[in-house]
């Protein structure tokens, strides 16, 4: 992970950290690095979420691409996974998403996809970064007919939702589905898809104003969709983050069904159908112990990676697996798309409900979660990795592990995108975990600041 590119592209406060000048350079240098071995005129597909700064950054980045002779297809406001799909579908040479996912509205981000719709490997990001950090430009300025042009894809949402429908063998008639669009990228595509599948849709937080993305809504605020489900008597509630690459669901009682539960439910269904490749689900070190226990009962294994959907995806591609994801709701169905896809995950989960003819609360019983506590310690970016060298912090971690006595675990993880060290404890006693995690986070803040 470099200085510009984090675990999920370049991210920062728009117009301060992520400036139009930087976006322009990312367009120019990105075009050069990604297209230098290609002898034909390239094209790039660009999509964005609903942030106010999306237009600013898209305009600047587009100018960079055009100056390099790259044609731009502007997809408009669209989920991140839709851009991954449309990059392939439209035969673009690469794709770009302008979004900061679950971060507050003042943040934004830029990430690239290759022509297959996969995030770029670290070494390619490092090449782009090296040019920009060393203030090196490339000696290419297209002129006349060689300057790039922009076309707007007016049917981008339709192309994406039509594709999603091809992944199903049933409709959703008779279901009432509550949707929290998080004032983000799925605010049009989610209701369109679900209505076309025959469901009754109750929709909230579908009026983005550029500043209300993720604000008191969406997948990081599941209590909002939970309350709506109970109020309207829905069969299921689904809640998206800002760029709709993740999903949190709630059952008919308003109880949260997180990414681990979704993978268990869909994984067991795929196993029964003989479609779970190698009988493996790919999770992360943050995946609940309960997921492993549930999958073992059905003769399946959970392979764990570092946190981050890019690492889950790498493992899936290398191992030939079809289902993987994170507790946070990033779930990848690799038979259909190359990235976490909130809408795809939602319809696969709902299709499983229909196939099994069971309520979501019933399906969710396949997995029992151990209590997990996550506390963030605020630590300067440059100090995030130093905790391993601090003897007092390491002694405290060992003491907690001894206390949990093999029936729990401690996981310390520096954030890839924010100045935080995440402290996660898992075990049987929620109250004990709360105290231990809070004390450890405080110690980390004291020692590392």
UniProtKB/Swiss-Prot annotation:
* Cofactor(s) the protein requires to work: Mg(2+)
Entry keyword set: Isomerase, Magnesium, Metal-binding, Phosphoprotein
What catalytic reaction does the record list?
alpha-D-glucosamine 1-phosphate = D-glucosamine 6-phosphate
Stored NCBIfam families: glmM (TIGR01455), PRK10887.1 (NF008139)
| Positions carrying Phosphoserine | 101
Q: Which domain of life is it from?
A: Bacteria
Q: How is it modified after translation?
A: Activated by phosphorylation.
Please give the organism.
Alkaliphilus oremlandii (strain OhILAs)
Name the UniProt record assigns to this protein: Phosphoglucosamine mutase
Q: How does the cofactor attach, per the note?
A: Binds 1 Mg(2+) ion per subunit.
> CDD domains under this entry?
GlmM (cd05802)
The record's HAMAP family line, in alphabetical order, gives: GlmM_B (MF_01554_B)
| Binding-site residues, Mg(2+) | 101, 241, 243, 245
Q: What does this protein do?
A: Catalyzes the conversion of glucosamine-6-phosphate to glucosamine-1-phosphate.
**Similarity section:** Belongs to the phosphohexose mutase family.
Supply the EC number(s).
5.4.2.10
């Amino acid at each position: 992970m470099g200085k510009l590119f984090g675990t999920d592209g370049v991210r920062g406060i728009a117009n301060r950290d992520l400036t139009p000048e930087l976006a322009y350079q990312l367009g120019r240098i990105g075009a050069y690095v990604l297209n230098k071995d290609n002898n034909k005129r390239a094209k790039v597909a660009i999509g964005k979420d609903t942030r106010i700064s999306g237009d600013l950054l898209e305009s600047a980045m587009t100018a960079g691409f055009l100056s390099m002779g790259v044609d731009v297809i502007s997809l408009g406001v669209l989920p991140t996974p839709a851009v991954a799909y449309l990059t392939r579908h439209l035969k673009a040479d690469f794709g770009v998403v302008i979004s900061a996912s679950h971060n507050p509205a003042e943040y934004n981000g830029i990430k690239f996809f290759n022509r297959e719709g996969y995030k770029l490997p670290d070494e390619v990001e490092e090449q782009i970064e090296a040019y920009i950090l060393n203030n090196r430009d490339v000696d290419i300025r297209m002129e006349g007919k060689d300057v790039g042009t922009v076309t707007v894809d007016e049917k981008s949402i339709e192309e994406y939702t039509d594709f999603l429908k091809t992944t199903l063998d049933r409709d959703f008639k008779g279901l009432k589905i509550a949707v929290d669009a998080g004032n983000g990228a799925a605010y049009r595509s989610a209701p369109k898809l679900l209505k076309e599948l025959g469901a009754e849709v109750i929709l909230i937080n579908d009026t983005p104003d550029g500043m209300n993305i993720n604000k008191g809504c969406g997948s990081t605020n599941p209590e909002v969709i939970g309350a709506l489900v109970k109020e309207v008597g829905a069969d299921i509630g689904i809640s998206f983050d800002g760029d709709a690459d993740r999903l949190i669901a709630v059952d008919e009682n308003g109880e949260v069904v997180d990414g681990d539960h979704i993978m268990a439910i869909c994984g067991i269904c795929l196993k029964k159908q003989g479609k779970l490749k190698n009988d493996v689900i790919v999770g992360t070190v943050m995946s609940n112990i309960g997921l492993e226990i549930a999958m073992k009962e059905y003769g399946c294994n959970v392979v764990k990676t570092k946190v981050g959907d890019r690492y889950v995806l790498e493992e899936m591609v290398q191992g030939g697996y079809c289902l993987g994801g994170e507790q946070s709701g990033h779930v990848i169905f690799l038979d259909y798309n190359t990235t976490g896809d909130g809408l795809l995950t939602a319809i696969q989960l709902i299709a499983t409900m229909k196939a099994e003819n069971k309520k979501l609360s019933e399906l969710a019983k396949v997995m029992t979660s151990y209590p997990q506590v996550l506390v963030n310690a605020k630590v300067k970016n440059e100090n995030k990795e130093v905790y391993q060298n601090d003897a007092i912090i390491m002694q405290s971690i060992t003491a907690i592990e001894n206390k949990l006595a093999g029936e729990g675990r401690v996981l310390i993880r520096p954030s890839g995108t924010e100045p935080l060290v995440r402290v996660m404890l898992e075990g049987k006693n929620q109250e004990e975990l709360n105290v231990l995690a809070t004390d450890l986070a405080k110690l980390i803040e004291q020692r590392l600041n």
